[in-house]
Regions:
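Cysteine-centric segments in proteins
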Residues: 1-75
Length: 75
């Protein structure tokens, strides 16, 4: 179930394709997305969206756009 997939995201009028993978995490899941050289982990939050965890700084608007795309895919 950890098969990689491509996540297409339209950000600032440009279509981006990010490598991503689904990860089982106990009773829930995480989705790891490679943005540039940084792996950003998205996990479900209490409101039905996704929160981002990253070790390096990443554009906040881009993270919000990716999180919204993931929320749409999970519905």
């Amino acid at each position: 179930m950890n098969e990689p997939f491509i996540l297409p995201v339209n950000y600032q009028g440009t279509e981006h394709e990010f490598k991503a993978r689904f990860e089982r995490w106990g009773y829930t899941h995480r989705i790891a997305v490679l943005i540039g050289e940084t792996t950003v982990t998205f996990e479900p939050d209490e409101e039905g969206g996704y929160r981002a965890l990253a070790a390096q700084p990443v554009d906040m608007d881009l993270l919000r756009t990716v999180a919204e795309k993931l929320a749409k895919l999970s519905n």
